[in-house]
Amino acid sequence: MAQGILVSTRKGLFEVTRGRSGWTVKDGFFLGDNVSLALHDPRDGTDYATINHGHFGVKLHRRLKGKKWTEVATPKYPEKPEGLVDLDGWGKPVKWTTQMIWALEIAGPNTIWCGTMPGGLFRSTDRGETWELMENLWSHPDRNKWLGGGADIPGIHSICVDPRDSNVVRVAVSCGGVWVTKDNGVSWAQSAHGMKFDNGPKSEAESPDGQDPHMMVQSPSDPKKFWVQHHAGIFKSVNDGKKWTSVKAKPSSFGFGVVVHPKDADTAWFVPGIKDEKRIPVDGAMVVTRTRDGGKTFKILKKGLPQKHAYDVVFRHGLAIDDAGKCLVMGSTTGNLWVSENQGDSWDNVSSTLPQIYAVRWA
């Protein structure tokens, strides 16, 4: 059973551990700072934390196993060529600066991938000492079709490294669809065909470049299968992302986070809500939905979750599952942190007083 959780919040990074009496918030780091994301690397026990200091920029910190946190290199964009007109899908100038680190994933030996706003993808082959921008994705002419969704600027929030071949990597962009490389970043192709958005011109609804996937996950046990929580609902692919099909769930198909069972590609969890202007749980009742049959049916899971006057939203990185597929953790915008040790059948509230939670990760 998993024993630790890294919780990234608006006011610091918190470690949560499991003892004899249950789950407890143990230590806090970078208190008062905006910690957008954390990563635990099981290869050597190293932890990474990204901090957004606003005016003072984005920083990346690393903690070797048993050591103190130290600052390491932050992914950095090259200087924008003089005279280059670089506009996003809204027609706004693109700033060539790291404005947020939105995704971190481990890959091959010593390799870490990093997704950022305004849409640059970086790779480190020395565990964060140095970073390389994937120039062929950044310079792709279709990048200028990307636009901001919930944020004002586009960003890469999901990175799926294929367990069969680490040279194959897929990234999801809000809003810019899904992109895949099969040669370790040398070339890239759009892979959001079949997705459909419902908040724009009908003539453009199925354009892959305008899709807004909120979160994408790949099945470790059956890597040709993917799940996406999209702005316009739930989508799945059973053929390596070549084609996506819509899946309907109640009480809502809208949400941000999704996780897939590590040993069963047809089992996945979502946190539904009312979309767009509202972005609150349906009827003020906090629930999780789970499918065990590839999206044909869903079960509403609510034991231990508030069913009246609940206004929690779970962000795209606010839901996580452990490697055994038994324990889930979920953190909300109101500072609630819940853990389930039975695949979501029931939930225990670990804390209701944390700052706004951006992301959770098992460690």
Question: Predicted segments — roles?
Answer:
Residues 1-363:
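Extracellular glycan-interacting surfaces
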